[in-house]
Swiss-Prot record:
Keywords: Isomerase. Its EC number is 5.3.2.-. This is Probable tautomerase SH1546. It is an enzyme of class 5 (isomerase). One of its GO terms (molecular function) is isomerase activity. It comes from the Bacteria. Signal peptide: none annotated. The active site is at P2. InterPro entries: 4-OT, 4-OT-like_dom, Tautomerase/MIF_sf. Belongs to the 4-oxalocrotonate tautomerase family.
């Protein structure tokens, strides 16, 4: 049972998240041969003030 955890910054539309789940599932099914029904995709959206790169929060960089 593959479990794929995707972390991204907030701001994607519901349609984009739906497509992400579909495409990640397709890729895992194709590359691992796992049964589609056993593939789990978990999306965690992070607030921009909870994520930093090079010492700067994404919310401060905009």
């Amino acid at each position: 049972m593959p479990i794929i955890n995707v972390k991204l910054l907030e701001g994607r539309s519901d349609e984009q998240l739906k497509n992400l789940v579909t495409e990640v599932t397709n890729a895992v099914e194709k590359t691992t041969g796992a049964n589609r029904e056993a593939i789990h995709v978990i999306i965690e959206e992070m607030q921009k003030n909870h994520y930093g790169v090079a010492g700067v929060r994404k919310s401060d960089a905009e």
